[in-house]
């Protein structure tokens, strides 16, 4: 039986290319999404065998979508697609629960291998990032983890995308007061004093594109 896959990437041309690649290899693409929120809704509906998420997506990034997936469908492994080779992105992805981490530049050759591995219950890292992960663990303790919770990252991403507090509340289904409270805690944790500083942090963490 063909492995059933959910694709999530905000660039339609990328999704089309990935879909063509996977269908050529005999996989079944059961859904396509342009952001993390759409991906989670489709995942609940289609219950794929494997989910492939872009790391940087609007409204809800791949990192937090992955973390949500571990609760929504704990048996469905997630492969993250990204251009980032820096260890902070890789470790954040693994902490979020990703089972695979594939560089977009290597997707044509490595995505199929990643899907096969995670579908069997294993993990997969693109060869180019494996060394970074090894070095990161050797240097364990030198780099602080992201101080923000998953919800705070979601709020931060929306703020960095230019959303008002009211718009953040609508997107996340929370009250305006709660959204404002999250914003205040984020600024306190990051010792930031303005939206520009929050945008810079979001870019550094790969939550939005520069």
Predicted ranges, named:
Residues 135, 142-178:
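Helix-turn-helix DNA-binding segment
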Residues 46-52:
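Active-site beta3 strand of CheY-like receiver
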Residues 187-210:
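Basic, Lys/Arg-enriched C-terminal extension of HTH/homeodomain DNA-binding domains
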Residues 54, 82:
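Active-site residues of response regulator receiver
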Residues 35-38, 59-64:
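Acidic catalytic/metal-coordinating carboxylates
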Residues 12-31:
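Two-component/phosphorelay signaling modules centered on CheY-like receiver
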Residues 41, 63-75:
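Short amphipathic alpha-helix used as the core "switch/output" element in two-component signaling
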Residues 88-95, 99-154, 196, 207-209:
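Short, flexible helix-to-coil linker/hinge segments that flank and couple to helix-turn-helix
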